[in-house]
């Protein structure tokens, strides 16, 4: 955010990156903007509640619209329906967080304070351990015809349980490396699922009460084309473009109202959120 302000990044471009930087033709470091989606509340990792929060935060922050009401029923005062809500639910349900071991590196590790000294010490200790092991081996008898192990062949002999333990250890190593204070900076990013999920309406907002299917789409009242739905992957990039298109003035007006509030002490419209 600070970098975007310092570069005077246009507000519409700033918003698009917050929602869909991974789907835009941008350097990988720009995926740091996706923290807007990933760093929200977790609700004990309840998937439907995390998605509900992302919908609410996205629309309150950009268009000043509260979307929580239409999760359970059509809005009584705004032109928003449950069909609109679950069309957006499908967008975020078709999006997944990138696992820790695969998070995109947004800055070379050399930029991390103390990284070079850390690497030197790591190499020094690894070499010392290797030299110690070699010296110890010399004290034991060696067969005339040593048996050579092929790593892949050895792994293929493991049963399913052992393979699971092995993968778990590798994942733990990745996790420790990722959490190291000397690890390279990584983006808390999201990505589209391989296969988008087709949303359905949850009757009364209950995930267990599945109603009719709906298309992934922008809320109908604000659409440029009434019948247009999202067809590119999850639909996040299309959503970002709909939020920031020039003939959707609500996004710009909400931003102007908030800027006015911070500069002048009170907003032009009394409900900036």
How would you label these PLM feature ranges?
Residues 1-37, 43-44, 171-174, 178-181, ...:
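Extracytoplasmic c-type cytochrome modules immediately beyond a signal peptide or single-pass transmembrane anchor
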Residues 53-55, 223-226, 272-273:
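Active-site-adjacent structural elements in folded domains
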Residues 22, 99-267:
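Short, functional "switch" segments adjacent to catalytic/cofactor/reactive centers
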Residues 7, 28, 46, 50-53, ...:
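Extracytoplasmic/periplasmic, Sec-exported soluble proteins
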Residues 2, 23-120, 124:
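Sequence context surrounding c-type heme c attachment/ligation sites in exported
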Residues 11, 68, 165:
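Short phosphate-engaging motifs
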Residues 56-60, 67, 74-89, 239-273:
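Structured DNA-binding interfaces in DNA transaction proteins
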């Amino acid at each position: 955010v600070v970098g975007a302000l310092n570069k005077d990044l246009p507000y519409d471009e700033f918003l698009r990156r917050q929602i869909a930087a991974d789907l835009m033709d941008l350097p990988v470091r720009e995926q740091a903007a996706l923290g807007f989606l990933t760093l929200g509340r977790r609700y004990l990792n309840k998937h439907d509640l995390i998605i509900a929060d992302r919908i609410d935060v996205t629309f309150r922050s950009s268009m000043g619209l509260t979307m929580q009401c239409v999760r359970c029923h059509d809005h009584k005062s705004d032109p928003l329906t449950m069909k609109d809500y679950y069309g957006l639910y499908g967008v975020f349900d078709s999006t997944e967080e990138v696992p820790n071991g695969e998070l995109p590196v947004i800055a070379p590790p050399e930029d991390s304070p103390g990284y070079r000294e850390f690497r030197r010490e790591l190499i020094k200790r690894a070499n010392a351990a290797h030299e110690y092991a070699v010296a110890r081996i010399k004290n034991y008898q060696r067969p005339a015809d040593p048996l050579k192990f092929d790593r892949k062949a050895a792994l293929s002999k493991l049963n399913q349980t052992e393979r699971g333990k092995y993968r778990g250890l590798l994942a733990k190593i990745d996790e420790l490396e990722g959490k190291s204070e000397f690890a390279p900076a990584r983006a808390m990013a999201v990505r589209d699922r391989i296969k988008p999920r087709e949303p359905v309406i949850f009757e009364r907002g209950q995930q267990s009460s599945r109603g009719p299917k709906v298309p992934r789409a922008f809320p109908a009242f604000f659409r440029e084309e009434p019948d247009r739905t999202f067809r590119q992957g999850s639909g996040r990039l299309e959503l970002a473009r709909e939020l920031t298109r020039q003939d959707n003035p609500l996004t710009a007006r909400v931003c102007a109202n908030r800027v006015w509030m911070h500069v002048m002490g009170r907003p032009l419209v009394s409900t900036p959120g």
